[in-house]
Amino acid sequence: MDNREKSRLLWKCRRGMLELDLLLQKFIANEIDRLTENQLKAFDNLLTHNDPSLYAWLMGHEEPEKELLEIVSFIRNCD
């Protein structure tokens, strides 16, 4: 992944909720180079959803749509 694409994803991690900002920015900073192409696409897709949905999925309050389940689980389990 080139630097421009990394920067674009980092920018998309900036949300309207501080909790999401912290969680997503930490995840992408630590994991971006280890994600597969499919995981990167899923992560990019995940970031198109609204903040309340993202928060509910990442906190485990709700289950995301099937195509996002793997990346959401991956984010939940990253430290």
Curated annotation (Swiss-Prot):
Keywords: Chaperone, Cytoplasm
Superkingdom of this protein's organism: Bacteria
GO annotation terms (biological process): succinate metabolic process
Subcellular location: Cytoplasm
Example of a GO cellular component annotation carried by this entry: cytoplasm
Known function: An FAD assembly protein, which accelerates covalent attachment of the cofactor into other proteins. Plays an essential role in the assembly of succinate dehydrogenase (SDH, respiratory complex II), an enzyme complex that is a component of both the tricarboxylic acid cycle and the electron transport chain, and which couples the oxidation of succinate to fumarate with the reduction of ubiquinone (coenzyme Q) to ubiquinol. Required for flavinylation (covalent attachment of FAD) of the flavoprotein subunit SdhA of SDH and other flavinylated proteins as well.
Family note: Belongs to the SdhE FAD assembly factor family.
Xref: PANTHER family: FAD ASSEMBLY FACTOR SDHE
UniProt-recorded name of the protein: FAD assembly factor SdhE
Organism: Legionella pneumophila (strain Paris)
